């Protein structure tokens, strides 16, 4: 029975490693953009614009009034 619980305890560690691997695989192509200053500038501007647009959309969807 202890062998069973040893196997059960291994699954959360496996899950964390799979999730971290997936995140690193998805994010790693974006690190290439930071090698050149011009592409990093455009990437930062684009990412900031994306965040602003998403924030505005979510505020409108949830009818959140600011100030």
Curated annotation (Swiss-Prot):
Any GO CC annotation of this UniProt entry: chloroplast
- Protein location: Plastid, Chloroplast
- State the InterPro entries in the record: Uncharacterised_Ycf33
Q: Which UniProt keywords apply?
A: Chloroplast, Plastid
What broad class describes the main subcellular location of this protein? Answer: plastid
Family the UniProt entry places it in? Belongs to the ycf33 family.
Q: What is this protein called?
A: Uncharacterized protein ycf33
What organism does the record attribute this protein to? Porphyra purpurea
